[in-house]
C-alpha cells in the first residue's frame, strides 16, 4: 500500500516485520504503517517512512505487527476451569467434571470473573475479536464493553437445566 501523500499522519509505527493480509500475508521486513484519522493510509519501507511527519511515532524494533487474531469459538468464563480434568476423554470430561462444576459454581459473578481473565489473556496475545457461547451473556457483554474488545455472543439453548435457566423454552425466552 503506497503512501497516499506525504501529509502529516497521526501515528507512524515502525516494526521489524509487518504481516499485511493483502496481497497474500507476505511478511515485510523493516517497514512502517502510517495511520491518519483512525485509518491506515500507508504501508511503506521504513526508509521512506522516515520522511513523514507524525504526531506519534512507535518503534517496535523486535516486534511483528499484524492484524488482530479472531477466536471463532469460545466459552470465555470457562477460563476459570482451565486444567480441570483436561486429560480425560470428552464425554467423561463433560459429564463427570465440567457439568457438575458448572452446576456448583457458575453464576453471574463467575461469568464476569472468568470473562475478565479470558479477555485480558486474549488482548495480551493479540486477539481483538472473539465468539462466546456461555451462560449469563449479559454479564459477559458488560465485561466486553468495559474492555473494548469486539465479540459475538450467542445464547445457550439446550434440553437440560443449567445455572442460567431450565429447558429450551425458558432459555429461549432469556435470549
Spans of model-derived segments:
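Short capping/connector residues at structural and topological boundaries
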Residues: 23-24, 33, 70-71, 95, ...
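Metal-coordinating catalytic core of metallo-dependent amide/deamination hydrolases
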Residues: 141-175
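Divalent metal-coordination and catalytic microenvironments
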Residues: 16, 33, 38, 62, ...
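Alpha-helical scaffold segments that flank or form the walls of functional sites
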Residues: 82-149, 175
Amino acid at each position: 500500500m503506497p503512501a497516499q501523500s506525504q501529509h502529516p499522519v497521526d501515528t507512524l509505527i515502525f516494526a521489524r516485520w509487518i504481516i499485511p493480509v493483502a496481497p497474500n500475508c507476505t511478511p515485510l521486513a523493516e517497514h512502517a504503517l502510517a495511520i491518519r484519522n483512525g485509518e491506515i493510509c500507508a504501508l511503506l519501507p521504513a526508509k521512506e517512512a522516515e520522511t513523514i511527519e507524525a504526531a506519534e511515532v512507535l518503534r517496535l524494533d523486535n516486534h511483528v505487527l499484524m492484524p488482530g487474531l479472531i477466536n471463532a469459538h469460545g466459552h470465555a468464563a470457562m477460563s476459570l476451569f482451565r486444567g480441570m480434568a483436561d486429560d480425560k476423554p470428552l464425554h467423561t470430561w463433560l459429564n463427570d467434571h465440567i457439568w457438575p462444576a458448572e452446576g456448583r459454581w457458575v453464576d453471574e459473578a463467575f461469568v464476569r470473573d472468568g470473562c475478565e481473565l479470558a479477555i485480558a489473556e486474549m488482548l495480551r496475545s493479540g486477539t481483538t475479536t472473539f465468539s462466546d457461547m456461555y451462560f449469563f451473556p449479559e454479564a459477559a457483554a458488560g465485561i466486553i464493553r468495559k474492555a473494548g474488545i469486539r465479540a459475538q455472543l450467542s445464547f445457550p439453548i439446550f434440553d437440560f437445566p443449567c445455572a442460567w435457566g431450565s429447558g429450551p423454552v425458558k432459555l429461549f425466552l432469556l435470549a
